[in-house]
């Protein structure tokens, strides 16, 4: 039978770089993998060819021998004891793709770090949990103690989290001898799979706990008290170590992460550690000056002087009346912005007074006078 060209199998040129060869292999292996082409013998045969080709071309010495002697370099007939390759004695196709196989198919093979990655992974850490918490601006200012109910799992009390009846220790899996993997030989090709007996755990529970059915944990709601520090803002994350999902079979629990959202306030707007408050003032107070009382986030009141001739948008600052910094560093300010109100629902007498005021106010409106002077100049220019 004619032997296939390894470069053609991977779809690369003879001068392809190691990275190009690896990239081509990954693409082919993913496309032809038996778990994705079950029952298709042609795809299985091509998959073997792809791995055989990659086993040679990824290795500098084997590649050099193949480039010089072709397939003869791996047939054991070279008097000089040439390299023995993927089809020769001692060949192990699993090595041909061990460096990328886990990366490609780790999700369903278990991966190096997961249950199917070899080694004894009976005790597994529990998953982390997320809890979204809304707090008021006042709570963010002062800090608060909040009680929450967290759904999730806890260690089984009946088996002490071991998963075995009576708290007995799990036993080494007889199928994989504790490795968590089994190997299947298919001709020249060796495939590693997650052990079907222990699910990659490496150990089995002979008599599963009747309460948790061998998992070592049970579903249970928990009530927790959470300390909300002063200065939190939307997006602040609080970590409660060990308050996440219970671990599997005695493994450590995960963590609980509290994500803070601060509700909008009816009076104050927040920008970091500073607070903004828009305060309405009458036209008379803005013109003559005066004093206005404003609330503060701590529940108190402060009096602010309104300068004579104030316009809408004028800002004044109250030092130290803002929000505290989350991790120290002082307290922000409160910025007061004036909003001059135009009176409505006037009485006849008020209208009369305003009409009189209108007639004599021209010289007292510097911005208005300047604007209309500019308009007049504009019109004069258009006429010219």
UniProtKB/Swiss-Prot annotation:
One Pfam family per UniProt: DnaJ_CXXCXGXG
Family recorded in the similarity comment: Belongs to the DnaJ family.
Protein localization: Cytoplasm
Gene name for this UniProt entry: dnaJ
UniProt name for this protein: Chaperone protein DnaJ
Zinc finger (CR-type): 143-221
GO cellular component terms listed in the entry, alphabetical order: cytoplasm
Statement: the UniProt record of this protein carries the keyword ATP-binding: no
Ranges for domain J: 5-70
């Amino acid at each position: 039978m004619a032997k296939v060209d390894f470069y053609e199998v991977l779809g690369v040129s003879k001068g392809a770089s190691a990275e190009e060869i690896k990239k081509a292999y990954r693409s082919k292996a993913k496309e032809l993998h038996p778990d994705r082409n079950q029952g298709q013998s042609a795809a299985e045969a091509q998959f073997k060819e792809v791995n055989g080709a990659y086993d040679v071309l990824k290795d500098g010495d084997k590649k050099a021998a193949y480039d010089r002697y072709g397939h003869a370099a791996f047939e054991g007939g070279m008097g000089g004891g040439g390299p023995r390759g993927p089809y020769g004695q001692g060949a192990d196709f699993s090595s041909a793709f061990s460096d990328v196989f886990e990366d490609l198919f780790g999700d369903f093979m278990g991966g190096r770090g997961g249950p199917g990655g070899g080694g004894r992974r009976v005790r597994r850490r529990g998953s982390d949990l997320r809890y979204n918490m809304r707090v008021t601006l006042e709570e963010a200012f002062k800090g608060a103690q909040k009680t929450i109910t967290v759904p999730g799992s806890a260690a089984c009390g009946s088996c002490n989290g071991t998963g075995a009846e009576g708290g007995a220790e799990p036993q080494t899996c007889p199928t994989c001898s504790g490795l968590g993997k089994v190997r299947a030989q298919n001709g020249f090709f060796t495939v590693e799979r997650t052990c079907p007996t222990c699910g990659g755990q490496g150990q089995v529970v002979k008599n599963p706990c009747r309460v948790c059915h061998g998992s070592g944990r049970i579903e249970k709601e928990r009530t927790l008290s959470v300390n909300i520090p002063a200065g939190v803002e939307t997006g602040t994350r609080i970590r409660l170590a060990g308050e996440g999902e219970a671990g599997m079979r005695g493994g450590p629990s995960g963590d609980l992460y509290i994500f803070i959202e601060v509700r909008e306030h009816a009076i104050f707007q927040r920008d970091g550690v500073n607070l903004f408050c828009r305060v309405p003032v009458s036209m008379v107070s803005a013109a003559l000056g005066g004093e206005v009382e404003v609330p503060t986030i701590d529940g108190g009141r402060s009096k602010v002087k309104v300068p004579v001739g104030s316009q809408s948008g004028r800002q004044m600052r109250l030092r130290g009346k803002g929000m505290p910094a989350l991790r120290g560093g002082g307290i922000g300010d409160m910025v007061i912005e004036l909003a001059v109100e135009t009176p409505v629902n006037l009485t006849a007498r008020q209208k009369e007074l305003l009409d009189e005021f209108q007639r004599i106010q021209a010289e007292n409106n510097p911005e208005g006078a300047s604007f209309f002077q500019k308009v007049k100049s504009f019109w004069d220019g258009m006429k010219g």
